[in-house]
Amino acid sequence: MTSTATIFTNLREVVTCEMPTEASVRSGVAVVVLDGRIAAIDDERILAAAHPTAARVDAQGGVLTPGFVDSHTHAVFGRYRSDEYALRSSGVPYMEIARRGGGIQASVNDVRARSEDELVELNRPRLQRMLRLGTTTVEIKSGYGLRTIDEMKQLRAVRRLAADLPLRVEATLLAAHEFPAEFRDRRDAYVDLVCEETIPAAASEQLARFCDVFMEPGVFDAAQSRRVLEAGMEHGM
């Protein structure tokens, strides 16, 4: 089998992250990629001699870094809640924002009103922008549906976007993100729904690798959280 090599040259800096507590920046070097994997970082002349038929990519003085890994995102959503940012920055607690009609429930109402196709088209440019800015792996949580049909809608949109874009996407089912308004006074009943309906449904279509829960005073308590996580484990998450 013939190996395919590419040498990246004219790099101002290469960030190797060799050490756990520092970036490990190197200058005056080139990088060779062999069959899709970084094979060596060295002087350009040394790499060129070792790989005389390699393709060349002129980085034009750019910086080469590892791809960013962006965990805990809700990158498939409807409208922005940027109006809440000023409130949070000024010290208004999240629970107060939620009481005023903002927070997670605002996103839930928005996502429930949108179709799967709309979520895909709305979020494709957002994920493309993340990729342009250096993110190569992203975890995307659901949690803006809070009922089985809408959690599935979110996760199906995630799957379609993952298939369309050169991003590594890890999907997480977060149906236990908040108690929806219709279950506000029947919290254990909502936990039953998540464990007995939503998690099995997502697992049946292999829509999520992970299962998560928002354990926080005023939201899911320890016992409820344990139930959700154990149900996820039982279904391979």
Language model feature labels by segment:
Residues 3, 7, 52, 131-134, ...:
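Short loop/turn motifs at secondary-structure junctions
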Residues 1-50:
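N-terminal metal-binding scaffold of metallo-dependent hydrolase/deaminase domains
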Residues 11, 31, 36, 61, ...:
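Divalent metal-coordination and catalytic microenvironments
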Residues 107-122, 128, 136-237:
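Metal-coordinating catalytic core of metallo-dependent amide/deamination hydrolases
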Residues 29, 35-50, 54-68, 121, ...:
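Gly/lys/ser-thr-rich phosphate-binding loops in alpha/beta enzymes
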Residues 96-99, 131-132, 168-170:
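Short, flexible active-site-proximal loops enriched in glycine and acidic residues
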Residues 56-122:
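Metal-associated gating/positioning segment near the N- to mid-region
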Residues 7, 54-58, 171:
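Conserved beta-strand scaffold positions in the cores of enzyme catalytic domains, especially
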